[in-house]
Amino acid sequence: MPDPNELNANQSSLSRFAFNIYGALNQAQSLEGNSSASPTPSMNPKQHNKSGTSSSNKEKLVYNCEREVSCISQFNHSLNGLVKNYEEDPLHHLIIGGKNYLKLLAMNNDQTKIVHEVDILESSKSIYSSSRTLSSNKLTSVNTIESQHDTIACELATGLISVYKVQNNGKCKLVRKYSDHIRCVNSLDFINQSNVANSSSPYQLISGSQDGTIKLWDLRSASNKPTLTISSNSHSDPVRSCQYSPHSTVRNKLTILSVHDSGALCKYDLRSPNGGYQHNINVPERKWNFHTGPALSLNIHPEKEYVITGGRDQKVCIWNYGDSPTHQNKISPDYMINTYGPVMKIRWSVYPDNIPSKTDTSSSQYQQILESKRYDDKTSSNERETISTMSSVGKNDPLFNYDFACSFLNEDPTISIYNLKRKYIPKEVISSNSNKPFQNFMWAQNISHSRRVWTISKSNQFMSYDLDTAQSDPNIIKPLDNLTSVSMAWNSGLGDFCFVNQEKDEFESISQLENDSFRSESEEYDPEFALASDGSGLASNSGMEDHPTDERSLKYRISSNSLDNSSIYNNHSKITVASIPIASNASNTPLSYQNPSFSNSVSPPFEQTTKPSLHRSATHNPMIQPPKPLSSILQNRSSVGIEALMEHGNNNSGSNSASVSGNHLRPTLNRNHSQSTQGSNVSLSSSIQGYQAPPPVSKRVISVNHPSPYIVPLSLPLPQNDEHAFEILSNNYLITVNDGLSLIDVCLYNANIAAGVNKFRDCQTWRVLAVSLEEDKFSLINYEENIRSQFEKAETAITYGSLDTYENNSNTSNSKTQLNQTNDNRSILSELDNFVGSFNSNSTSTSNYGGVHSEKDTSNNIELSNANNNGSRKASFSEIKPLSNLNSPSHLKDVLNQSRSNSNSPVISRSNSMLLKNRKTINTGSTRAENHESAIDDDDGMGNAKTCELNENDSQFGMKNSELKKHSSMSAIDSEAIDNDFPYNIESAKASPIKIGSQHKHEKNTTSGSMSPQNKDSNHRGNIINYQRRLSLDPENSRKNSRNAFNYRHTNTWDLDDENSNIIGNRAQWATNSSLSSCGVSSYQPRIGSPNYSDQLHHSYSSTHSSPRPYYNSTTPGSSRRNSHISPVHGFHNKTSYAKQSPVSQKLMRDEQSRTELKDVQEQIEDLESIEETKVTSVNFGKSELTRAITGNNTGSPNTLYKPWKTEYLLKEALEFASLQGDILLCSILTILFYDYLKVGKDSHVFSKEQSLDWLSLYVEILHRKQLFSNAMYVVNMAPKELLPDLANLASTEVNLRFFCCWCQKLLVNEKSKRKALNEDSFGYWYCDECSTKQSNCIYCDEPCKGLNIVTSLSCGHRGHFGCLREWFIDQENIVCPGGCDEQVI
């Protein structure tokens, strides 16, 4: 099981690979290697063993130095007098130098142990103690060490160079000291014709110093002066590194390369034309400027004239410094690699990759597979030739066979190993064991020829790393193994969507397409290399070393290389267009590696038949005409035949002179290796007369038979990828709540914007969020009102209990008339309460069912509303306008508009619990009005018909009483005001005979819900009831006073979803229970969820239906009432008649009655707090569950109640869907708007802070990609404050700009001017140090153009400041250049 910490470190390291930023793994590992007896802060010297090794990795060597060390080198000389008891003398040892520190560490053969230590400083003192000059060993700091054979040279920070000789027994002596340099020496190198370990001792030494000079020293001379000095005439450019080139001796030259602080690479030839050496060289032979900053290191390739340089500009450049004219005229490096940090040191590997080591099994296994296939009887001759070429292909490209390593500045504890085959990703990354930066490193020579790196870190620790056994070393990581082989991108410029694919074992190499005459002068002709480069089937395989080891891949390669035209030409019936190889060009192929032109192909040297052209990568040659397109041939396919198709696939000449039918295939010519000439490079199918020798072209290819890496662009018709819609939405969406708007208004506005670009789902999402926000707003208001109403319950009950105003109020005739309002435009279907039809539907308006609704009613309602508004602000039912039709499409919109218009009204801001409490108190108050009631005497001679009419009027009053209950959402004061306005006319009461009836008769007949003739005395009503009866008997009077009536029906709650399927049964049960309630009996309904719900429901139902059927129809229009377990006459005392008491007694009884009723109210408060049970049993009986939940669940806290339509739940679903669909725009806009609303990071579960940051950063990146920079900046500025710091860091990107001189066209580095400029002065690229001229001033103001505010004219080339040119062209409306050149720009 891998370590999770290690996996996290690996994943974090992959982020450095973006934009060619490589390296990784800042991880500290425990020290598990062997060490010397040197004391360190983390290790005890007594616990170390000099020759001990780590138990986990026996190949790893660790040594801790006593002092600060800074440089390292390898001593390749035998120490047989010091190291004994070995079959072979160890030849490779270690030298470490530092501050007053210079040691030689002798190793065993496999370099896993340090067997002896030699202090060079102490040894040299004992030998030359009598010498006054040579015994001075007051070292300060060893800066560089170089060794060859038995000679060691070290240079100090003071400029002193010391040369030592080492004997076989380890004794050292100081032989030379050179002190001609005046500053620190940065580089040393020996000059020898044969740079091998067993050669004779070197006799020449070069040194490069910070004083800007390179000096040549003759070790054989007794003089301490240099033989030759190289310096610059213009200025002293410090030399960072210099090296002798061993490859230039073939041309009898002595070449030295150096890199300087100016970033220049200089090439010097020390030989004079007359022989010998030049004494002083001031001008280099060649000079290249590859780096924009100081170049810090260089190293020459072991086999070819290529040099690699690294600098502070985070670039690695590879350049051919040979004398070939092809390379002399180049101004850019052959290869350039971007690194993630400034390069401090860079070195080529001493061994190529194709040399198998003892631990390398993949290479040997691959060779075994090749050999087994080569001598297999089933293998054809063509396949054998292919295998033979593939076996030798690895040693034909030395530039690609060598790795190179680089270390970095800025405290980076890594060393990256690269190869040009996969130059953008390092092969290995070495991390420091102590998490300290590396001070120095080198490639170590060893007898096993393995890739081994020696390092020293700033923790003064030496460590050896074997890259061939990296699997067992936790400090060596291969990033390529952790990367995917497929990458993709949206809107990359090639298409809506594109992806790049490349196998991990496919590496680059160089193959020359041309003949041998165009090779570099320094290259010797290699027949095998010519074979690989000239063969069309093998050109793509040159330089291949990392072969796949599986047999299936090998079989694929062999079969791909052995294709011939016989399968096409002999099977004419099976030929298809897809099987014909077609040349691709730059116009129709989006690949960075295009297929080669067919005129460059040559015949394979090992085949007699013509092969079809293989699809391989090459550089397109514009000098050669492409072949005729296939489409023109296919149009004439019927007349031309199959021969034209064959010619199109094999005719590589590109000649347009011959017709399609006229050119026939020419016989194939065998080409021997010795016959490689310029003329033999002609294509087989081309015309000799039209042949022209192509210019020299080289190409970089992949070692496979298909283009690699290849890119696949796609154009996908995705609605979410609409560029026009994206731009409109990003420009017009509101992402902040402006002044005068609310979040609801912003959502509705964004909904209209989304609908404008046919984003209807997004439009609906915004609208739903707007409705949910409004619902949350009213829920919060109702909750706050409920909290405040708890303190008014007792006072409200007392207020409604004291109804003395009924006795003294004589101005209530108009209010009395209002209770008789029954003229509402209800349809017959509305009897089912929205089961079918609408509540206020006018579908039956022609029948005038339910009475005629006159226009005067509306006017009177408006007058009453205005009258109420003139006085103190009291809620009246006329303030709420009834809706016309619930089934209309605009019903929901009307509901939303009405709720908005009345959001400040206390009528709609009350909770349902308050409705019940106020309704109960109103019922209680209505019973107290019976202190002065009079019952209708049954002795007045009224018949049964009249009694029935009276009972019907009672039913109508019961309806009105129920309507009053429905509208008891008013405050206590408002309800009291309406109760005080109830009509009580004494004169009208005396017009009819009254008599106080017996209450016992009433109780006996309450279950029937009707009034029989024998029980007409038992209906105990007051003056209000009598007045109602008289109005019902006088229709004219009813119509006369109906204009003052209230229209209460609009406050009913409606079933918006129309899903109550059992409404008929509920209405039947409600009718019976309502009749019971109208008679003063509490009809108890069982509560849903109670333990005895089933039994109680059965008992209630059976007791209700066992009674006689009522005389009148309870479902008569206008008699709709809500059932309640609280009786309308709750608290009414039996056998009590206030009319027979004295006024004082009546007053006392009323007060006592009020106190009793107050006690009863307080006892029932708990029952009324249970909203869900109360709604089911009393308030919302007959509604669906969804309607009850929407309209009634308002008593709890809005934050604790679960409502699926709450904003946070709807927003969560919308964000999840948008993120799955890839709609980053919607996710980002919702995040900005609702981040503070949901309090993300505190108690929100909709989205996290990390998700918000990801959405916004990706949205800003997309805006940058689409060049909507102003929108991106606006999004960053409007982001939540918590995300703004992180988002600003992600959105900001560094831009590297290079400026070139407008006169000499050279790069403006200006290092010299920078050093002269003061720290407080701002330095701009307006002056060129190379040509010592100032750049062009602004053409308008004639001031220097500094910074980025420069605009260049498209035609005349003049430039100026942005503000100046804007003033000239826009403000002054000019169209020509302000420089007077009369060039029309606009």
Swiss-Prot record:
Bias-annotated ranges (Basic and acidic residues): 1148-1157
Bias (Low complexity) ranges: 595-606, 649-663, 859-872
Compositional bias per record (Polar residues), positions renumbered to this chain: 31-56, 669-690, 884-928, 1006-1016, 1090-1121, 1134-1145
WD repeats: 180-227, 234-278, 290-329, 382-428, 1171-1212
Keywords of the record: Metal-binding, Repeat, Vacuole, WD repeat, Zinc, Zinc-finger
Main location: other
One GO cellular component, as annotated: GATOR2 complex
Region annotated Disordered, chain positions: 31-58, 595-629, 647-691, 844-958, 991-1021, 1090-1157
Molecular function as annotated in GO: zinc ion binding
A Pfam short name: WD40
Keyword Zinc-finger: yes
Location(s), subcellular: Vacuole
Keyword presence, tRNA processing: no
Family label: Belongs to the WD repeat RTC1 family.
Cross-referenced PANTHER family: GATOR COMPLEX PROTEIN WDR24 (PTHR46200:SF1)
Reported function: May be involved in a process influencing telomere capping.
Annotated protein name in UniProt: Restriction of telomere capping protein 1
